[in-house]
Amino acid sequence: MYNLNALIDRLIEISKNNNLIEDMDTVYTRNRLLSIFNENSYTPCEEKLTLSFHETLNELINIAIEKKIIENALYSKDIFSSDIMNIFLPTPSLINKEFYKRYAISPKESTDYFYSLSKSSNYIRTDRIAKNINFKAPSKYGTMDITINLSKPEKDPKEIALARNSVKSNYPKCLLCIENEGYEGTVTHPDRANHRMIRLSLNDRTWMLQYSPYLYYNEHCIILSEDHVPMKIDISTFKNLLSFVDKFPHYFAGSNADLPIVGGSILSHEHYQGGNHRFPMNDAKKLFDFSIDGFEDVECEAIKWPISTIRLRGENIDSLVLASDLILKKWRDYSDETLDILSYSNSEMHNTITPMVRKEDGKFVVDLSLRNNRTSKEHPLGIFHPHEEVHHIKKENIGLIEVMGLAVLPGRLLKELEKIKEYLRDEISLDNIEEYHRPWALELKKKFDYLKSATDLNDFVNKELSNKFVSVLEHCGVFKLNEEGLEGFKRFTNSLNN
C-alpha cells in the first residue's frame, strides 16, 4: 500500500495542474486531507508518485478502508471520494462569479471552465464513462450513434440490503433538486459533496446548469428548474429552450416529453438536457416542406426521420415560440384513427412533443418530434413504443437522447453480442445464446454466411445492431415512412392552417 503522505502530495500536485488550487493553497489543502484521514501530523515524502488522478484517488480510498474510516462498499467509497475532492472546490457563489466573469468574454469560455472543473473534481465520472462502448454505424437514415452503457457500477447484495432497510428521507426530494448541491449522500442517494450548479435566468425564472455525472455525449448538461415542479411541455418550454440556446449558442437544448411511456425517467422535476454534440437527427434530410399562415418568417418542413418530426428555422425567437406552441396545441387534440392516433381515451391525454433547439448558420432550428403514449392489448407497453420483437435490444422509454439518434443500450449486450459473434463464427451452438436473442441470431447467421467473405464480423454486427435500433425508433413514429403514413403526416401539417 502506498504512503498516505505521498498520495496526498500527488493529489495536490494533480489538482494544481488541473487549476483547482494554487501554490498558496498547498498547506491548507494538505491539512484538510490529513483531517479526514484522522491524522494530525505530516512528514514530507522523498518518494514522488506518478499515479494518475483516479489511481491516486483509489489508493486513498483503500487507505480509508484499511483504517476503517469507511466501509468497503461502493456507496461509502463514492461518498468518501467526493468528500476528498470537495476540499479542492470553491463554494457555489465563487464558482458562479468566475463563470459569469468568463461569460463576459464568451459563452464558450464560461462552459469550458465549468466543464473542466466538473471533470477535474471527479463530479463527472470520466473513469467510469470510459468503460462505455461507443461506435457509429450506417443506417437508411444516416449514421447512428450507438452506446453500450457500462458506466454505472452495479450494487452488491450487501448494499442492496442496506438500501432496502434504510430509513426513507424526502431530502433532497429527487436526484435533480438544488438541495443536492454539496449533499453528503447515503446508501440510497448518490454522493454530491463535490456537486456545483450555475444559476441561470430563463424566461424570468431561476434555473440551474450542471453536467451529468455520467455523460452520454460531449458536454452533456442538465438545465433544471430551481423549484421541484413536474415536467410539462407548453409555450414556456419553447421560450426556455430558445432562451438557453440564445445565451449559449454553441450548445443545443431539448426536453423529454411530459407523459409516461414517451417521457424520460424523471417526470417529477422539470428539466432539460443540452450539450455540445451533433446528433444524427441534425443531419436528417427534408421529407417535404409546408407553410403556416401568419409565420412567413419561419421555414417549416417535415424531416426524413423514423420518429415523425417537424423542423422549424428562423431568426426571430418570438415567431418560433408561437409557431411551436401552435403545433403543440394542434397535436395535443389531433386524432387519426386510420393510423391508431387518438389524442384522448377516457379523458387521458396521449399526445405530446419532444422538442430540441440549436443554432446553425445564424438561425435557430427547432425540431418537434410528435409523440403518442397510447397502449393497446396488442402493445400493452405502448403502440408507439418499442414493440416486443425489439425488447431483446431495448425495451425502456425512448427519450430525448434516443429520439435524436443516440442509442443508449443496456450493458448486458456486451457479453451477449460476443456470444452471437461466436455463433456466427460456428464456435458455439444456438443453444448457448440467450433465448430472447435466438430469432435475431438465426437471421444474422443467414446474412453473414452469405456475406462472410466480403465483410468484417465486428462491422457486420455493429451495423445490424444499428438497424435494430432504427427499428426501435420506427416503432415510436406516429406517421410511418410509407405512403399511408406520409399522407397522414401531410394531413396533420395541413391542419395547422385550419
Swiss-Prot record:
Similarity section: Belongs to the galactose-1-phosphate uridylyltransferase type 2 family.
Any single biological process term in GO: galactose metabolic process
Assigned EC number: 2.7.7.12
UniProt catalytic activity: alpha-D-galactose 1-phosphate + UDP-alpha-D-glucose = alpha-D-glucose 1-phosphate + UDP-alpha-D-galactose
Compartments in which it is found: Cytoplasm
PROSITE patterns per UniProt: GAL_P_UDP_TRANSF_II
Keyword Chloroplast tagged: no
Pathway: Carbohydrate metabolism; galactose metabolism
PANTHER family listed in its UniProt record: DUF4922 DOMAIN-CONTAINING PROTEIN, GALACTOSE-1-PHOSPHATE URIDYLYLTRANSFERASE
Species name: Clostridium perfringens (strain SM101 / Type A)
GO MF entry, a single one: UDP-glucose:hexose-1-phosphate uridylyltransferase activity
Top-level taxonomic group: Bacteria
UniProt gene name: galT
Full protein name: Galactose-1-phosphate uridylyltransferase
A Pfam family per the record: GalP_UDP_tr_C
GO cellular component: cytoplasm
Keyword list, A-Z: Carbohydrate metabolism, Cytoplasm, Galactose metabolism, Nucleotidyltransferase, Transferase
Coiled-coil residues: none
